[in-house]
Amino acid sequence: MTAALWLGLSGVLSAAAQAAPLSHDVTIGYVQIADDSRYDDKEGPAETTIAPPRPLPGAEMAVDEVNIDAATVGRLDKLDHEEAGSADALTAQVDAMAAKGEHWFLIDAPDEAMETLAKAERDKDVILFNISARDDALRGGACQPELLDVIPSRAMLADALAQFLVARKWPNVLVLRGPLPDDKKDAAAFASAATRFGLRIADTRDFIVSNDPRHRDQDNIALLTGGASYDVVYVADADGTFARSLPYATIRPRPVIGATGLVPTAWSWTWERYGAPQVSHRFKKRVGRDMTATDWAAWLAVRALDDALRESHATSTEAADKYLLGPQMNIDGAKGPPLSFRAWDHQLRQPILLTTPDATIADAPMPGFLHQTNVLDTLGYDRPETKCKF
């Protein structure tokens, strides 16, 4: 990063006010939404229901871990967990906590709520760590200087799959797209990745899950996967009901990727390198379940903040933020290369794991994909492509 660019960035971060003094002990805000539909019970196999877990335990584990080292310098990190009653109440909740002196916040909120919050907090003395919203717009036209995206974007996940297909020489893809808004966003991200990496979309077909005979053509896997030539099937299905039955049911014997089969993710218990098994084991021993991608994002956000505080010896929040977003930041995320935030959109650059339920098959960037400065920037929107303007 050039000196001029960094001076411009630091000016944006400090536009709201003079640097706030840094308390010896640090309280990290954590805010989630009570009625977040992403955590509603979802239909599972054999008439079961599945309740997706919230990522709070990841942050709690990280706070306990960093306090072991922080205690040696007399610092204690605390987590202030609050719940907004609704998406509309999210900004008021963050503002109330900021009024108590809290500066750093982990935010677990869906795309639209995150965008509204980040816009409302622009030029305020806060930093928001996005640990669960994947919308590309948050890293693009709706970006804000106070928003740091820890969870990977849809574009990063799609690019990882596209690189894998190129590496395996499976260039022809049949896309099956569900009816939900997230399905359409995921399919659009994959289509963009396909164009970027030279894949060919053989066809895009919409499915719905229904017992209505009028929708037979959109609910029958054999019909949906017949009549086209392709190497692999990509399925966009946010709730997973359709995707669950897709592998081994396609009319042609082809692998399935996307929402099932080979799935791109920030974290998996099957990842066995760079200290990852120890992280996964500590989490499972503590919480009683496997660590998810959002658990990892919450854990990583706390670890990143601790690294910035410890390495910078900052005496103000502004100085800590400058280090956190600076070129010298190297975060150990148990995924191999050091992680850091991109200057142009504040997305955390990171490898993407390509996993099945039982194994990590590959981690992207795939070998052979090169970049002039950082190979991790082959995933997601690079500086020349970004629509983000702080």
Which residue stretches match the model-derived regions?
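Bacterial N-terminal signal peptides
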Residues: 2-14
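Extracytosolic ligand-binding ectodomains
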Residues: 17-390
